[in-house]
Amino acid sequence: MKFETLKIADLISEISMGPFGSNIKVECFVDDGIPVLNGSNLDGFVLKEGSFRYVTEEKADSLGKANAHRGDVVITHRGTLGQIVFIPQDSNYDRYVISQSQFRVKCNEKILPEYLVYYFHTRIGQHKLLSNASQVGVPALARASTTFQKIEIEVPTLEYQHKIVDILELFRKKIETNNAINDNLAA
């Protein structure tokens, strides 16, 4: 199997940082609307639904590229570094607003978003992702979107990516099922 070494910039069609913190103030939150992501939603490989705060559709519209959609990949650049998830096609919402501590990418036709996320959960992927981390004060990735785009990764053919993702998804779903069973037993 032949892998091609490509920069992230060659694998994505869009990258966008979260809004400035002052763009989402406490008074912007409402009881229902467009969910705003936080670190607890970025635990694991797939976006975790729940524990959302919401903004109105108008507020989300005003935040433009800080809106993430199904198929997008969301990465934490400040706080709990190393978090990276994809938003599945069957997510509960059509769109989400990323926080000021996150950025999002839209993959192009050369890579599956699931493959990209699984890659960055490997030891080498985490090393590459965290290589520009600053530990002074709040942990952060220096120039997050710029440095992320310069990372080089090994990319197989799309056919092989599909095979890898299919196998890893089977394991991920089995683990989720087992965890749900364990949670029910503990209750």
Describe every region a protein language model picked out:
Residues 1-20, 154-187:
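Non-catalytic DNA-recognition/assembly elements of restriction-modification systems
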Residues 5-26, 40-73:
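Sequence-specific dsDNA recognition surfaces
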Residues 11, 37-40, 108, 156:
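Structured loops at beta-to-helix junctions and adjacent beta-edge loops in soluble globular domains
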Residues 33, 51, 99-101:
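A generic structural signal for short beta-strands and their flanking turns/coil linkers
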Residues 38-39, 57-125, 137:
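A short beta-sheet element
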Residues 95-103, 134-165:
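A short glycine-rich beta-alpha junction/loop motif
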Residues 121, 130-131, 154:
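Well-ordered mid-protein domain cores that form the structural environment of catalytic cofactors
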